[in-house]
Amino acid sequence: MSSSELVDTDEWVVTALKAIAHPQRMAIMRWLRDPESFPPQLEPASEVGVCLKHIQARMGASQSTVSQYVAVLQRADLVHCTKIGQWSHYRRNEDALARLNQLLPEII
């Protein structure tokens, strides 16, 4: 790995760890592990993700607060967003999480 790739990787790891280093964002990531635990949706949660309104209801926070939380996770590439009509659905980016899981032992 070149030094510029290493720097990019290190910066991504820092961004990802900062994103999940918050109790509510960590909870969202944990909840999204089991999308079927949320109320049924028109589109299967396992395919498109969980609607933001369901995450908001589980968290008991305002829509704007939950939107900010998932935006941080999305900027860190830890979640994907799928828009269906006016609704945003979120699911974990398992490839990025596997990469993070692979890189952490090299750091710690």
Name each model-derived stretch.
Residues 74-84, 91:
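Beta-hairpin "wing" of winged helix-turn-helix
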Residues 57, 68, 74-75:
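Alpha-helical residues within the helix-turn-helix
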